[in-house]
Amino acid sequence: MPAVYKRILLKLSGEALMGDAQYGIDRTVVERIVVEIAGVLQLGVEVAIVVGGGNIFRGMKSAGDGMDRVTADYMGMLATTMNALALHDAMRRNGVVSRVQSALRIDQVVEPYIRGKALRYLNERKVVIFAAGTGNPFFTTDTAAALRGMEMNANIVLKATKVDGIYTSDPFENKDAQRFRNLTFDEAINKNLQVMDATALTLCRDQKLPINVFSIFKTGALKRVIMGEDEGTLVII
């Protein structure tokens, strides 16, 4: 059976990279994520990734603690670049060819974001890892994922989290919480379900770009989503 999606935008939160730790990058977790990505590449799927930085630095929290918000957001963007390099290195060790592009210029470390080059890399079956969010303060990496998904002509945005979908309430606190198999964008926004921030949701809704929220910690979940199986929660128009 062929994959349902030809090109995906995978949103990896920084928290997903730290596993059960309280901070930093868990190399074992990163290696396992790379193996999952390699599996979908073998299906002929083209993969672009937007990575968060919350495992290293949380800009909004620091701003709430008194730091200038713009400074805090730029620090968060640098944290995403560290995560992107960690992913890139793990891919190299596993034989996956990837390129890192940053919305902030750090030319001695990573390439600047150039849409045409990113599209060419995807056509060449290289994984493209986008760092530094949108390059602008006040915008989350969720919004960056929506933006890059549209710019890369992705068929879907896949948000990889610690939870296997969107629930009626927090499944860690309520064992009776029910997983939604499907939601509309308006339902997600009106019910204030924590899918993505409102800006990202609205962008995806307006461009008719579906989102699937799934657990990156479930072995094979990424492949099952790609194959169109009942995995995670699909958010559509």
Curated annotation (Swiss-Prot):
A Pfam family assignment: AA_kinase
GO molecular function terms noted in the UniProt entry: ATP binding; UMP kinase activity
Activity control, per UniProt: Inhibited by UTP.
Record-listed UMP binding positions: G53, D73, T134, G135, N136, P137, F138, F139, T140, T141
UniProt pathway: Pyrimidine metabolism; CTP biosynthesis via de novo pathway; UDP from UMP (UMPK route): step 1/1
EC number in record: 2.7.4.22
InterPro entries, A to Z: AceGlu_kinase-like_sf, Asp/Glu/Uridylate_kinase, Uridylate_kinase, Uridylate_kinase_bac
HAMAP family linked: PyrH_B
Role noted for this protein: Catalyzes the reversible phosphorylation of UMP to UDP.
Protein name: Uridylate kinase
Organism: Nitrosomonas eutropha (strain DSM 101675 / C91 / Nm57)
